[in-house]
Design a protein with these regions (language model features):
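Predominantly soluble domains enriched in secretory-pathway, periplasmic, or organellar proteins
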Residues: 12, 16-382
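Sec-dependent signal peptide recognition
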Residues: 4-9
């Protein structure tokens, strides 16, 4: 009987605490702090960012900000959303607990790209003019700025966040910036002569973080890079017009979408041999994997179909038809769901990765969405 009374007291305390928390806003449905659940898509027509509930397949909130957003990133530990303001060389920081703007960052440079650091506390802005600016979101202060790169839009952090890799296409090299030393510490040549017309992708990491992959798009090859010794260890010929590679989360394969010949090259990470080239029949803009890396979704640069590739049998399945061209895709951290926006209409599509079917399609309330992001995803290589 005493134990029953104790249990009842604990339940009563829990319920009263929950009620008090609700009053204080600690359990408010307005919170958008679950980094694996909520995705964020910047409107390209309104001063807002759309929060998407990936679990329920619906719009969770419309976050109003003082400007039309450029790119966005969300942090998990700090529960913050950062939206760039390229026209004013600035960025806005929003608290996801209450959706209030808590800081406006004067960057002193145009933020053409934005990406989070692995530590979750820092955010990096890059410009086509070759400047990188790193900010501490816990203090809303700039940590340091590095200038003088050819371009600073093709950026990737190392697995632990201690290094920033900046691809410089014309020079066909990667500049390595050390976060602790706040300076460039190395340059990694990608092979070949400098070329003002060269097209090169950003670097992608293997799942373990030891190996990097860069597509030299204009030369139909990828460079395989030792990210410990900072050197190219192999150059592999792939299809025509390869874009940014993608490493599967199980570290078995590297996937290279070939834009110009509409195919997907599959490379085994252990042998670095091409194991398959699968027709996609679309001009690719990126690739994502889902359902425990058994399926790849190739997102289109144009057109209204997503290519579906079976990674167990290395063959194409029926494509997924959408009502318009899709944005980039994000895959939830449980690998079950692909989320994308329809660029021209502002609709959001939720795709079940197991069945390969659209499970939900809903209006976001804004005319155009592009650049969907989530704090915690199935993507381990970017």
């Amino acid at each position: 009987m005493a134990m029953k009374r104790a249990l009842l007291v604990l339940v009563a305390i829990s319920l009263s605490s929950a009620a008090a928390g609700d009053i204080l806003g600690l359990f408010s449905s307005d919170k958008l702090t679950d980094g694996s659940r909520y995705a964020f898509a910047p409107s390209k027509s309104d001063r807002s960012v759309i929060a998407i509930d990936t679990a329920d397949g619906e719009i969770a909130a419309v976050i109003e900000i003082p400007h039309v957003p450029g790119g966005v990133v969300a942090t998990n530990e700090l529960s913050l959303l950062v939206a760039t303001d390229p026209e004013n060389n600035a960025a806005t920081v929003v608290n996801l607990y209450n959706r209030e703007v808590i800081a406006q960052l004067d960057l002193g440079m145009r933020p053409d790209v934005v990406l989070p650091n692995a530590y979750d506390r820092f955010v990096t802005f890059g410009s086509t003019d070759g400047s990188v600016s790193i900010w501490d979101l816990s203090t809303s202060q700039q940590v340091f700025r590095y200038d003088g790169l050819e371009s600073a839009t093709l950026l990737t952090y190392s697995f632990d966040g201690g290094l920033l890799f900046a691809v410089e296409p014309t020079q066909k090299q990667i500049s390595v910036i050390d976060m602790a030393r706040k300076e460039k510490v190395a340059e990694i040549p990608l092979g070949g002569e400098a070329d003002p017309n060269a097209e090169v992708s950003a670097l992608s990491r293997s799942a373990d973080g030891y190996t990097g992959y860069v597509s030299i798009t204009s030369e139909n090859r990828i460079a395989v890079i030792d990210l410990v010794d900072w050197k190219v260890i192999q150059s592999l010929s792939v299809g025509k017009g390869p874009i940014r590679p993608f490493s599967t989360t199980d570290n078995r394969y590297v996937l290279v979408p070939n834009r110009d010949d509409q195919s997907l090259t599959v490379i085994a990470t252990t042998t670095r041999n091409v194991v398959a080239t699968v027709p996609t029949n679309i001009e690719a803009r990126e690739v994502n994997t889902a359902w425990l890396d058994t399926v790849a979704f190739v997102m289109p640069a144009q057109g209204d179909e997503i290519a579906v590739i079976d990674l167990q049998k290395f063959r194409a399945e029926s494509p997924i038809k959408l009502p318009g061209r899709s944005d980039d895709g994000i895959v939830t951290s449980d690998s079950k769901t692909l989320i994308t926006a329809i660029v021209e209409t502002g609709e959001v599509a939720v795709i079940d990765a197991q069945s390969r079917n659209v499970s939900a399609l809903f209006d976001s309330g804004t005319a155009s969405l592009e650049g969907i992001e989530i704090a915690l995803s199935n993507n381990v290589c970017h």
